[in-house]
């Protein structure tokens, strides 16, 4: 399948990175190489390292970055330290993470990310490890509820989990539309009528669980920040409130001076900030981009500079 990709908040990311043509940069989520290509085009003696755990994305990015000062590596961005060590790169001058599911993964029904087309219930970005079907057919009601509530902020998590457990006693839940119909059937009729995509939150939750996305984000942010050179910029695009909250909290913690417990009345840590916030509030797409690229609707960009 053709790997189509319109990079989200592209000009804002390029501005946020403040690219040095001689610098070393990391794109931790290569996808269709939309951001990577524009970063690499701005380098002269510099170098770009693009990572992606999806083998389809790696092949596409490698082809699209051919002839540019860029190298593509199949890895999750949580593995940044290992990759940079293997490439003998001690520090980088900037990094970008675009945390959205790529258009290719959504458009390729066989990957099992979409609730609009019937396909095997997969959702693995790396195409390795347990699938979404493995999770929904084996986890108990309590754990399913936790996943749907914590990762999807789904108000009907307990009811949906109950429907899943009951349904799989008769037949395994193996396809995306089978799962989507089951989710909708657990909701009150009024909720189904007002909610255009009743399966959206649950699909998000299961996808996050299958891919360990929030753990990867936490580990990846720490790994990348530790390799940023002073003055290096870190840009992260999020697409839902869970990710944005994590990024916001992490950035603020790096930018704050005092790290004493909030209940302690007097500072004793003598702490100095490790970074400064370039964006106090997240940057969102303007009207023109929203019209051109629907995927940008929920995108939020935060930018940090290491001190």
What are these regions (language model features)?
Residues 1-307:
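S-adenosyl-L-methionine-dependent methyltransferase catalytic core, i.e., the SAM/SAH-binding region
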């Amino acid at each position: 399948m053709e790997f189509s990709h319109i990079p989200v908040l592209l000009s804002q990311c390029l501005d946020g990175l403040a690219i040095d043509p001689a610098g070393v940069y990391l794109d931790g989520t290569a996808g269709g190489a939309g951001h990577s290509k524009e970063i690499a085009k701005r380098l002269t003696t510099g170098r770009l390292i693009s990572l992606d755990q999806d083998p389809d994305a790696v092949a596409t990015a490698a082809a699209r970055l051919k002839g540019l000062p860029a190298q593509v590596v199949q890895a999750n961005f949580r593995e940044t330290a290992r990759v940079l060590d293997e490439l003998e790169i001690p520090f980088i001058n900037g990094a970008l993470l675009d945390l959205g599911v790529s258009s290719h993964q959504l458009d390729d029904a066989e990957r099992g990310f979409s609730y609009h087309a019937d396909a095997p219930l997969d959702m693995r970005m790396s195409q390795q490890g347990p699938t979404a079907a493995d999770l929904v057919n084996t986890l108990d009601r309590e754990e399913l509820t936790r996943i749907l509530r914590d990762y999807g902020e789904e108000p009907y998590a307990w009811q949906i989990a109950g429907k899943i457990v009951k349904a799989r006693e008769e037949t395994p839940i193996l396809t995306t539309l089978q799962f989507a119909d089951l989710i909708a059937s657990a909701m009150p009729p009024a909720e189904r009528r007002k909610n255009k995509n009743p399966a959206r939150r649950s699909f998000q939750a299961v996808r996050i669980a299958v891919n360990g996305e929030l753990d990867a984000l936490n580990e990846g942010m720490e790994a990348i920040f530790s390799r940023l050179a002073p003055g290096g910029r870190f840009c992260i695009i999020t697409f839902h409130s869970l990710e944005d909250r994590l990024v916001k909290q992490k950035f603020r913690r790096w930018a704050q001076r005092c790290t004493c417990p909030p209940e302690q009345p007097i500072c004793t840590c003598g702490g100095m900030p490790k970074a400064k916030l370039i964006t106090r509030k997240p940057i969102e797409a303007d009207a023109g981009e929203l019209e051109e690229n629907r995927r940008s609707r929920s995108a939020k960009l935060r930018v940090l500079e290491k001190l």
